[in-house]
A protein has these predicted regions:
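Small-residue-rich transmembrane alpha-helices
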Residues: 270, 274-277, 286, 311-341, ...
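Juxtamembrane segments of multi-pass membrane proteins
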Residues: 58-69, 408-530, 535-538, 547-550, ...
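Peri-transmembrane interface segments
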Residues: 46, 222, 226-264, 280-282, ...
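N-terminal Sec/SRP start-transfer signal
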Residues: 1-30, 297-299, 306, 310, ...
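The feature marks short, hydrophobic/small-residue-biased sequence motifs that occur predominantly
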Residues: 36-37, 77, 84-130, 164-173, ...
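Interfacial "coupling" helices/loops that link adjacent transmembrane helices in transporter permeases
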Residues: 15, 271-313, 669-708
Length: 782
């Protein structure tokens, strides 16, 4: 075995704990990068497969009751390759007919499960349902914990007689967000059963496959006109868009954030290697001096001390690559299940090993080159000179600055002076701690900003619930609802989907004198009630460069009408997976003219006397029972907010996992530095023990050093964390919705506590090492 390799292995074995900490940091950095790359690549493949799958609908149109005859007419239109009908009915389900809470259920009726060609579902267990039976999406078991053979009861409203169905299978709905996030279960039943329950004779959902998907907008307009001329209302039109698929932007944001933190982990591992090489060279200064005096050049010396970095990097890569692939597989499976995607079989693309080598070997070698170059360039006289223990108090500005500390605590003064003994090493350690603290502060700020923004956005809507009717009523029905004991105020609203050019928009009909929509004007004014006035949400105004007084062509169904933009409001609240580019607000009458509701109303916003979730649920149950003659349906506003917060919790969970890893690497870096300090100061420690310093004194000394490093790292990390938090909030806001930056004193305090705790924990090991060092061994060193 070459002598240089033997020397390197001896050096690494000589300081086993230090080498293990460095190896651990490299492996974690490699694993993080590989896991994110593996996850992102496989999820991209899964999303591409879903989009490329001929099963997916190019157009998804929600309609009123539509007969098979009209469906046949639509199938003969140009560019239409295939049309299939469904019945989608929103109801509630429970395993107990006497249960107090019934989760929301989207029940889809299919005519022939074995002949489905569009939006095919996958049968995971059991069989497809027949009359009186139901198949439940597997993700819905988090809301409805059913097993095959169980009886599931469904009812649309309080007071209805529950319908019993036997569970005969479990399915998987491709590209559907997990039921636990949406707080809505999915299930399938024979179309005849669902029609009967929904009181329909035909279908209410049309799925289209097109010959030229890029002409979907034109085809959708043609279909809307045909349905409009027949008086069939259109609830929404969804054009399949690979760049704006359901959940795509949320996933992209998550992966971007995870990538940022995995890069931080890789950078920290580089710092660990740099510290290790610096320590090896510091321990072997005399040997380096002798080699230089015998004619060894700088490059030869650098090669000598780059080999430990290569060995540590290679070993870290060997450990981190499989760990990253396993972690990426687990993370990918978790995210794929949330998004209804099927991952490809386990695989390894060239980019994962390349990334592993770059982070595991490239970063350590570059990090090691700096101390190696600096050490190899030191003059021989400086390398062979032996240092002693001398009184240097008062000789430097730092000593004079720290003199008050010495009056309070001699140990505290020694700890602070020890931090300044190796400025480069201490600086790197402080930076490692700072990055860890910054990562924690940034993620906590991002979480608080998202939650605070969600609270503010949903605070715009003062309605506690939305109330829909199955029979035609007039807007004056709001007065009847206001007379109910549980209702403080009721307003007739409306909601539908539309287009502004190629962009999907949510269209809201809201009274001009509303009290249940607390609009926040950014420009212009709220509409006065005059026809053809519209207020646009800020996100849509930005995307389409809309300004006040601009004329906007709005398409709803087969109707196109020009509207004058009179205002822009701050309202970017949206449901998870929404493909709408923003919101339009106009009078209820304008929406009715465009949707054939005439003088009828189908949606009411309710402010209730109680606002807590339990009180809202109880009030809605009583309201449904009191107004069952109009076939009401209710939706609690808190449920939509809870769905959004559930998605935020997933984001927060994964980010905190990454920050935990970064924090562990940071603690390892701090421990590494303290171990190096103990190693270099063995003679000093021996002298302290010889003159009477006890083990407790030495332990407190190392704890004080660690605390000093932690506090300095916290100071730097607070600044870096603020900048990083700003960047993360801006990045997330650009991908999802605009976020309000929220950095609270509690976040700053928790960051400080975490930095101090990690510093103390990292100091315990080196402190015990110093405390158990025998004086005779320390003074005999070298």
């Amino acid at each position: 075995m070459p002598i240089l390799l033997l020397k390197t292995l001896r050096d690494l074995r000589h300081r086993t704990l230090r080498s293990i900490l460095t190896l651990f940091g490299i492996a974690i950095g490699v694993a993080g990068i590989v896991a994110i790359s593996y996850t992102a690549r496989n999820l991209a493949v899964a999303q591409t497969a879903v989009y490329a799958d001929a099963s997916q609908a190019d157009l998804n149109i929600g309609t009123g009751d539509i007969s098979p005859t009209i469906r046949n007419v639509l199938e003969r239109l140009p560019n239409v390759a295939l049309v299939e009908g469904r019945v989608v009915y929103y109801t509630r389900a429970s395993l107990d007919p006497a249960a107090a809470r019934w989760p929301d259920l989207r029940l889809t009726g299919i005519a022939d499960f074995n002949a489905v060609q569009i939006n095919r579902i996958e049968l995971l267990a059991g069989r497809y349902p027949e009359a009186g039976e139901i198949a439940i999406d597997a993700s819905a078991r988090s809301l409805i914990p059913a097993e095959i053979g169980d009886i599931v009861y469904t009812r649309s409203r309080v007071g209805d007689r529950p319908l019993a169905r036997r569970v005969v299978g479990f399915t998987r709905t491709p590209a559907a967000i997990d039921a636990s996030i949406l707080n809505q279960a999915f299930a399938y039943a024979p179309i005849a059963d669902v029609r009967k329950e929904a009181n329909l004779t035909g279908d209410n959902r049309l799925l289209f496959r097109l010959e030229a998907p890029d002409e979907a907008g034109t085809t959708a307009s043609r279909i809307s006109r045909i349905l409009g001329t027949r008086g069939i209302p259109i609830g929404f039109v969804i054009v399949r868009d690979p760049e704006n698929a359901e959940g795509r932007r949320e996933l992209a944001t998550l992966l971007q954030l995870l990538t940022a933190f995995s890069i931080l982990g890789g950078v920290l591992s580089g710092f660990l290697v740099s510290n290790t090489i610096s320590a090896i060279m510091a321990e072997e200064m005399r040997q380096v001096g002798i080699m230089k005096s015998l004619g060894a050049g700088r490059l030869r010396l650098i090669r000598t001390y780059l080999l430990p970095a290569l060995l540590l990097g290679g070993a870290g890569t060997a450990l981190g690559l499989p760990l990253g692939v396993l972690g990426g597989g687990a993370l990918g499976t978790f995210l794929a299940n949330l998004l209804g995607l099927r991952l490809p079989p386990p695989n390894l693309a060239p980019r994962e090993p390349l990334l592993a080598l770059t982070v595991g070997v490239g970063v350590p070698v570059v990090a090691a080159a700096i101390p190696a170059w600096r050490g190899a360039g030191t003059p021989v006289s400086g390398l062979v000179r032996s240092y002693g223990v001398a009184a240097a108090r008062g000789r430097r500005f730092l000593d004079r600055l720290l003199r008050p500390v010495g009056r309070l605590s001699a140990l505290g003064l020694m700890a602070l002076r020890a931090v300044g003994r190796r400025p480069a090493r201490s600086g790197v350690t402080i930076l490692v701690i700072a990055i860890s603290a910054a990562a924690f502060l940034a993620t906590q700020t991002l979480d608080a900003s998202v939650r605070g923004t969600v609270d503010n956005l949903y605070g715009i809507y003062a309605a506690d619930a939305f109330y829909s009717v199955g029979r035609t009523v007039t807007p004056r029905y709001a007065t009847d609802l206001s007379q109910l004991p549980d209702v403080a105020r009721a307003e007739a609203w409306s909601r539908t989907a539309g287009f502004v050019g190629p962009l999907n928009v949510d269209v809201w009909g809201v009274p001009s004198d509303t009290e249940l929509y607390r609009y926040r004007l950014l420009a212009g004014r709220w509409y006065s009630g005059q026809p053809r006035e519209v207020v646009v949400s800020a996100d849509h105004a930005r995307r389409d460069s809309i300004t006040v007084d601009q004329l906007l062509q709005v398409d709803i169904g087969d109707q196109r009408r020009p509207f004058t933009v009179v205002g822009i409001v701050d309202d970017e609240s949206t449901y998870l997976g929404s493909v709408a580019s923003g919101k339009l607000f106009m009078t209820v009458e304008d929406v009715s003219r465009l949707t054939y509701y005439g003088d009828g109303a189908n949606l009411f916003a309710l402010s209730l006397t109680r606002h807590d979730p339990a009180g809202v649920d109880e009030a809605l149950a009583r309201i449904e029972l009191a107004t069952r003659d109009v076939l009401p349906g209710t939706f609690a506003a808190y449920a939509d907010k809870e769905s959004t917060l559930q998605a935020v919790r997933v984001l927060t969970l994964l980010l905190r996992a990454m920050v935990t890893i970064v924090g562990i690497v940071g603690a390892a870096g701090s421990a590494n530095t303290l171990i190096l300090n103990v190693t270099e100061r063995r003679r000093e420690i021996g002298i302290l023990r010889a003159i009477g310093a006890g083990r407790g004194h030495l332990l407190r000394l190392l704890l004080a050093e660690g605390l000093a490093l932690g506090l300095l790292g916290l100071a730097v990390g607070s600044v870096l964390g603020y900048l990083l938090a700003r960047a993360l909030v801006d990045l997330t806001g650009a991908s999802l919705f605009r976020l309000d930056f929220l950095l609270t004193p509690a976040i700053a305090a928790s960051t400080a506590i975490l930095a101090i705790i990690l510093s103390i924990i990292a100091s315990v090991g080196p402190g015990l090492l110093a405390a158990h060092l025998r004086p005779i061994e320390a003074l005999r060193y070298e």
